[in-house]
Amino acid sequence: MSSSPVPLLRPPVPGNRGNGPRPPKLTLGIPPSPNSRPVDGNGVGPAAAAPEAPQPQRPSTRPAPPQLRLATPMGSSSDVPQEVPRLANGRPAPPPLATTGLNESTGHSRSSSFTYLDGKASGPASASSSNYSALSFAMGLRQPHGSTPDPSSAISSVYSDREGGVQMERDNSVNGLLPDLDKLSLEKGRPLDVDDLDDEGWLAASEQKKIIELGSLGEGAGGAVTRCKLKDGKTVFALKIITTDPNPDVKKQIVRELNFNKDCASEHICRYYGAFMDKSTGTISIAMEFCEGGSLDSIYKEVKKLGGRTGEKVLGKIAEGVLNGLTYLHSRKIIHRDIKPSNILLCRNGQVKLCDFGVSGEFGTKGDANTFIGTSYYMAPERITGQSYTITSDVWSLGVTLLEVAQHRFPFPADGTEMQPRAGLIDLLTYIVRQPIPKLKDEPENRIRWSDNFKYFIECCLEKEPPRRATPWRMLEHPWMLDMKNKKVNMANFVRQVWGWQD
């Protein structure tokens, strides 16, 4: 018997909104989980007996917890021999650089305060290429020597073969000479810009010193993101350099699959201009659209620093943008796989865009526990336990993201208690799988009230049974979404208030 769909069309229940200042007194931090170890199944085997008089088995009366098995969502766990990468002269290639997680910059700190930031003029002017699941990583398992991560899950979950896809990337550093960009500029009669370069062109721009750095956007153990432009070009772009060390064949597949993303054309998807692999350093560089408003993660932390709270109407526009982006990606047969606050960007005009569909999640598991943990916090229960990963898993991650931004804290555990500092990741993942889902609650002490439809939207996103969880396009028909679509919100003014821009 098939499961009934989630009842999204429940009549909306109006909620009250309080007026006046709402100074939050919450602390942020993705806490570890309670200081307790997961309970293993403790079935007792048959009792020992003499051969002539065997005794019956005595099963344990203790119930076994849900099975938390190792996950291989998109890949294979079989070992595949790795070939030693070699240079053009036949000698073995030097090992790539070691890893180092990407922390976003959260500058522009000010001491002013806000009430609800809803776009109004109130307030001051202003990756996993691993074959293991989150649980196996938390238990200390590592990839066996000689095994190769499955390239099919290297960047985004492209779940159909694309005609000519293998031809999308030429091995530009071995099979041919790089283009002379000065000559190409003369032929075009104008300076080159981001749309003029393919992957060979981007590698040539790097080697011919045509990429001008304008400032750092963040750096850490996994790499760095820099604001750049091409020499004599007009477009400012973000260059993300990833220094982690997956298998070389996977790196090539990553560059190929980024070209799938390059063909995406949606106002809700951060545009990818190109990517290239530098074999001398073992890094992958990704040129992408620069979104000046920053990530939702940096925005809500800045709002918290200012003593405010992101308003429900702003959250509605953010949710609408994410759902539209996920719907578009699904039409391209792509699953994002890594929805979280740091992968939701806002432009200066307030446009919401998705970035990193798979990039940070895939690289995050390789030698950087903090990055991996940060990603796995937003995983749907089915992904934690190794079940198939679908587009509705991204809807779960959206629910966790909205709940975190609304409450200014990570929503697990649901009661908001502080967790023990030495509790392990496996405890938290087990908690997410086994315990009731968190709910959005009003905060009378801070005079903060959320609408009943918003609370119901979060509840629908955090449906634990995948068949009952709605798709992104179905969630766009939710009563809360229909209500939010009719709201007038100046998202550009909201971003301007957060960062204190005067123009």
From Swiss-Prot:
What is reported when this gene is inactivated? Results in severe sensitivity against cell wall-disturbing compounds congo red or calcofluor white, and drastic alterations of the fungal morphology. Impairs phosphorylation of mpkA.
Q: Which InterPro entries match?
A: Kinase-like_dom_sf, MAP_kinase_kinase, Prot_kinase_dom, Protein_kinase_ATP_BS, Ser/Thr_kinase_AS
Question: Which residues make up the binding site for ATP?
Answer: 217-225, 240
Gene Ontology terms, MF aspect = ATP binding; MAP kinase kinase activity; protein serine kinase activity
**Might you give the EC number(s) for this enzyme?**
2.7.11.24
GO biological processes: cell integrity MAPK cascade; filamentous growth; MAPK cascade; positive regulation of calcium-mediated signaling
Its taxonomic path starts at: Eukaryota, Fungi, Dikarya, Ascomycota, Pezizomycotina
- Stretches of Pro residues bias are at 53-66
State which gene encodes it. Answer: mkk2
Catalytic reaction equation(s): L-seryl-[protein] + ATP = O-phospho-L-seryl-[protein] + ADP + H(+); L-threonyl-[protein] + ATP = O-phospho-L-threonyl-[protein] + ADP + H(+)
The protein's UniProt keywords, in alphabetical order, are: ATP-binding, Kinase, Nucleotide-binding, Transferase, Virulence
**What protein does this entry describe?**
Mitogen-activated protein kinase kinae mkk2
**Region Disordered, annotated ranges:** 1-130
**Family statement:** Belongs to the protein kinase superfamily. STE Ser/Thr protein kinase family. MAP kinase kinase subfamily.
For this protein, the record's Gene3D superfamilies field holds: Phosphorylase Kinase, domain 1, Transferase(Phosphotransferase) domain 1
What's this chain's function?
Mitogen-activated protein kinase kinase; part of the cell wall integrity (CWI) signaling pathway composed of pkcA, the bck1-mkk2-mpka MAPK cascade and the downstream rlmA transcription regulator. The CWI signaling pathway regulates cell wall integrity and pyomelanin formation. CWI also controls oxidative stress response, gliotoxin production, iron adaptation and asexual development. Finally, CWI is constitutively required for A.fumigatus to cope with the temperature increase found in the mammalian lung environment, during infection.
